[in-house]
Amino acid sequence: MKKTIALVTGGFTGESVISLKSAEVIERNIDSEKFEVYKIIITPESWYYIDRNAIKHTIDKNDFSLNIQDKVIRFDGVFIGLHGSPGEDGKLQGYFDMVGLPYTSCDALTSAITMNKGYTKAIVEGIKDLHTARSIQLFANTPSAAEEVLAGLNLPLFVKPNNGGSSIGMSKVKTAEELPLALEKAFKEDDQVLVEEYIAGREFTIGVYKGKEGIKVLPSTEIVSSKEFFDYEAKYTAGITDEITPGRMTGEEQARVERVVTEAFRRLNCRGVVRIDYILEEETGKFFFIEVNTVPGQTEASLIPQQVRETGRTITDFYTELLETALGK
């Protein structure tokens, strides 16, 4: 008997555009013989499903159900395809825990923590062979903020909204004069900003997931961008970035990376599939942790689908494993 699945998408931030594109890919690739899928769009104004006749049906938030032509649709589980808030910061996960619905992503606590880049770095600190860039976390754009940063860190710097995604509001700062504008840009996206020293090296991203056989690591992807860094345009515009899967690493580097990201996944108590970004430092080859994305993109241009295909599996088979693991099958 088919399981009834809610595919949630949309969101409250600028990443909602990417969420909708991810949902299109997910919806096309979920096994229709095993799952009946309803795409639920979540916006600040409404949670709803649009049927084939373009009629909008509002979700009953009391139990996350639908009423279509006097038939109540209740879900067996949720595939979370919503980037940013409320799908990636723990809010939806907490709600689904309260109404008793299983879902494909990390739980509420892990989602909330990993959305905060500074807090995540503090938790993974101490994992063998994992390094983090020196950083300062700012909680307000005070007149002395730039001065505080320059006194504590060495240029060049990366300035990031602490709770953001898709590199929105992020800047690379090479001179002291560029810093105030970069801080202003980041604080427009978030009320916390993380400033990190730049690490010169090769940039990679790698998928890690928990399936029927425990924690598994996907092939890495090496990011070679023609831009200064892997920003929003580089991530979602064809031709700007070369994405090499599997990434070019020695056998020792690959084994070390797999061990480090598996331990980070375990320490952060992750579930479902996450994407961990890292740099192998130019001169030393050391692993520098950047961040973890608990609802990684699933668009045609996204990296997790590339990595899954590299293993010889179909994305349909992969989504089936994620759903069945979440449902406890």
Tell what function each PLM region has.
Residues 222-274, 303-329:
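Active-site "cap" helix and flanking loop/linker of ATP-utilizing ligase/carboxylase catalytic domains
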Residues 5-9, 21, 72, 113-202, ...:
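Active-site nucleotide/adenylate-binding loops and adjacent lid/helix of ATP-dependent enzymes
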Residues 44, 142, 163-165, 199-202, ...:
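Glycine-rich beta-alpha junction loops
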Residues 197, 265-298, 308:
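Conserved metal-phosphate-binding beta-hairpin within the catalytic cores
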